[in-house]
Amino acid sequence: MERDEEASGPMMEMCTNGGEETSNRRPIISGEPLDIEAYAALYKGRTKIMRLLFIANHCGGNHALQFDALRMAYDEIKKGENTQLFREVVNKIGNRLGEKYGMDLAWCEAVDRRAEQKKVKLENELSSYRTNLIKESIRMGYNDFGDFYYACGMLGDAFKNYIRTRDYCTTTKHIIHMCMNAILVSIEMGQFTHVTSYVNKAEQNPETLEPMVNAKLRCASGLAHLELKKYKLAARKFLDVNPELGNSYNEVIAPQDIATYGGLCALASFDRSELKQKVIDNINFRNFLELVPDVRELINDFYSSRYASCLEYLASLKSNLLLDIHLHDHVDTLYDQIRKKALIQYTLPFVSVDLSRMADAFKTSVSGLEKELEALITDNQIQARIDSHNKILYARHADQRNATFQKVLQMGNEFDRDVRAMLLRANLLKHEYHARSARKL
């Protein structure tokens, strides 16, 4: 059997966790240095550990941040049952945090012993259920095995056992529970095609979905589209999440993440009217944006053509976004698309643009700006030409006046033709002129 022993969080209910923390946390994603304690408090279980380890592995030369992340990951792992990941973290720490954060063989042996005893107990129970052919008991037995393997960090085995419950589901609620478990493990394994598949399966009966479950499915679908670089689809999913979700899906995603992922994907993929209608005027999504003021302000600045301010917000956010386990691979692509859209939007209203002033607005050199504009012109995204000597961009707007004259002349000719045809018909009827075909002899 395949095993993934990377990580584990505490045993948890994977489908219907209600989110015990109801406090409205303040923004973590901002231009300030990452407050790792506040950031980690947004999550629970395995994703909390994996996010901390991701930060420890990607924080560059910031040893203080790395040590804090490793220390918190160590403490969190010891609340669970994943001894393999514990050993890996201890090796990563390498005696740099003192004896308190060293190898605890007694703990590992005790946890492994309890895990083996629990596994034997679950096997005996499942064998009994299968002998008695009680479908509901068999379903719960496989589900318990899935929970067990998930807690031990064996994600492949957890996934297989959750999927085995499918043959013993007797209600729509059971099927949704199975799908939510499969989605959770698939996200942790990075198998986002599986995520999409089980989201679609859970949504087959939308009238039976509870609002909270529906919100979780939209989050999972948004993450899948994000990982597959389908940014517009990802934005739509995140924008449709009900704000009542709150912290109830923090074994996967925090409300601040929904605002950040949804906002950046929308900026990169929506046109101006969509941005206004689906983001800025979206009352539900506004609740998420309030948790991340920097993202809210950069969206408003972009829409209001305050590009210098927008780009400053983006620059200040970048270092923290690169430490995000889901977003880090997409930051450069999203930023590039947002910048291109800003350049295009800046040039649209003008017949000519002073490249020096435009370069100041975009915090770049004139030569660098020229190269960016050349690429956009070559891709036919901007209809313009560059006067490199005088450093001016001249727009090639269509001649609206000439086009209007041509359209009027065409309409006039068509009207004249129709009137002449009607007059001819009226005269023929007036003089009772009827063309008859010649009779055959």
Swiss-Prot record:
<feature type="domain" description="PCI">
    <location>
        <begin position="230"/>
        <end position="400"/>
    </location>
</feature>
<dbReference type="GO" id="GO:0006972">
    <property type="term" value="P:hyperosmotic response"/>
</dbReference>
<dbReference type="InterPro" id="IPR048624">
    <property type="entry name" value="CSN1_C"/>
</dbReference>
<comment type="function">
    <text>Component of the COP9 signalosome complex (CSN), a complex involved in various cellular and developmental processes such as photomorphogenesis and auxin and jasmonate responses. The CSN complex is an essential regulator of the ubiquitin (Ubl) conjugation pathway by mediating the deneddylation of the cullin subunits of SCF-type E3 ligase complexes, leading to decrease the Ubl ligase activity of SCF. It is involved in repression of photomorphogenesis in darkness by regulating the activity of COP1-containing Ubl ligase complexes.</text>
</comment>
<dbReference type="GO" id="GO:0065003">
    <property type="term" value="P:protein-containing complex assembly"/>
</dbReference>
<keyword id="KW-0217">Developmental protein</keyword>
<keyword id="KW-0736">Signalosome</keyword>
<dbReference type="InterPro" id="IPR045135">
    <property type="entry name" value="Rpn7_N"/>
</dbReference>
<dbReference type="GO" id="GO:0009651">
    <property type="term" value="P:response to salt stress"/>
</dbReference>
<dbReference type="GO" id="GO:0009585">
    <property type="term" value="P:red, far-red light phototransduction"/>
</dbReference>
<dbReference type="GO" id="GO:0005737">
    <property type="term" value="C:cytoplasm"/>
</dbReference>
<keyword id="KW-0963">Cytoplasm</keyword>
<dbReference type="GO" id="GO:0009646">
    <property type="term" value="P:response to absence of light"/>
</dbReference>
<dbReference type="InterPro" id="IPR019585">
    <property type="entry name" value="Rpn7/CSN1"/>
</dbReference>
<dbReference type="Pfam" id="PF21151">
    <property type="entry name" value="CSN1_C"/>
</dbReference>
<keyword id="KW-0539">Nucleus</keyword>
<dbReference type="Pfam" id="PF10602">
    <property type="entry name" value="RPN7"/>
</dbReference>
<comment type="similarity">
    <text>Belongs to the CSN1 family.</text>
</comment>
<protein>
    <recommendedName>
        <fullName>COP9 signalosome complex subunit 1</fullName>
    </recommendedName>
</protein>
<dbReference type="GO" id="GO:0009793">
    <property type="term" value="P:embryo development ending in seed dormancy"/>
</dbReference>
<dbReference type="InterPro" id="IPR036390">
    <property type="entry name" value="WH_DNA-bd_sf"/>
</dbReference>
<dbReference type="GO" id="GO:0000338">
    <property type="term" value="P:protein deneddylation"/>
</dbReference>
<dbReference type="GO" id="GO:0008180">
    <property type="term" value="C:COP9 signalosome"/>
</dbReference>
<dbReference type="Pfam" id="PF01399">
    <property type="entry name" value="PCI"/>
</dbReference>
<keyword id="KW-0607">Phytochrome signaling pathway</keyword>
<dbReference type="InterPro" id="IPR000717">
    <property type="entry name" value="PCI_dom"/>
</dbReference>
<feature type="region of interest" description="Disordered">
    <location>
        <begin position="1"/>
        <end position="28"/>
    </location>
</feature>
<comment type="subunit">
    <text>Component of the CSN complex, probably composed of CSN1, CSN2, CSN3, CSN4, CSN5 (CSN5A or CSN5B), CSN6 (CSN6A or CSN6B), CSN7 and CSN8. Interacts with itself and (via PCI domain) with CSN7 (via PCI domain). In the CSN complex, it probably interacts directly with CSN2, CSN3, CSN4 and CSN5B. Interacts with the 26S proteasome subunit RPN6. Interacts (via N-terminal domain) with TSA1 (via C-terminal domain). Binds to the translation initiation factors TIF3C1, TIF3E1 and TIF3H1.</text>
</comment>
